[in-house]
């Protein structure tokens, strides 16, 4: 089951103490390492066309935005008053297909990308169809301004191209 080990980790933490902060995130990418953004850029250069899942909806999260949030969280004078599970991802929603189209367009590439359904691309773990996170607790607790995913994607692709 997708996410089972993550849930087990959260349960272990909550069972061990009542003073904790867990940050859940989704669809994480950056200019470093292996991730969806870098994979799409590479595949656009290697393949004549791409087929990308269009029926799974979530929110891409730029690792630099997550890191900035965590740094602000740690520096919060009232950190001790905040415990629990917090959701952090960029603002907005997208399908993997929407995300891939944006990556291609921002990078100035022209590879044709076609939408497919999940069943057409089997994976070992079944991913959720809708994984958009509610960030109300993060916003209410810390007043953090969360960038829109496409704006952050532009920043990331600019860094990759440097």
What is each stretch, according to the model?
Residues 5:
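Active-site helix of classical SDR
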Residues 11-58, 64-65, 71-72:
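NAD(P)-dependent short-chain dehydrogenase/reductase
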């Amino acid at each position: 089951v997708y996410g089972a080990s993550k849930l087990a980790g959260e349960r272990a933490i909550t069972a061990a103490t009542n003073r904790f902060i867990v940050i859940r995130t989704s669809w994480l990418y950056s200019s470093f390492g292996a991730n969806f953004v870098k994979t799409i850029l590479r595949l656009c250069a290697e393949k004549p066309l791409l087929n990308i899942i269009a029926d799974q909806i979530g929110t891409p999260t730029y690792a630099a935005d997550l890191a900035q949030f965590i740094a602000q969280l740690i520096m919060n004078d009232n950190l001790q008053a905040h415990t629990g599970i917090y959701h952090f991802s960029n603002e907005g929603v997208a399908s993997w297909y929407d995300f891939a189209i944006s990556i291609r367009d921002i990078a100035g590439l022209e590879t044709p990308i076609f939408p497919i359904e999940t069943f057409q691309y089997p994976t070992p773990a079944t991913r959720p169809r809708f994984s958009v996170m509610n960030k109300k607790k993060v916003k209410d607790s810390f007043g953090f301004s969360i960038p829109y995913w496409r704006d952050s994607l532009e920043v990331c692709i600019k860094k990759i191209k440097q």
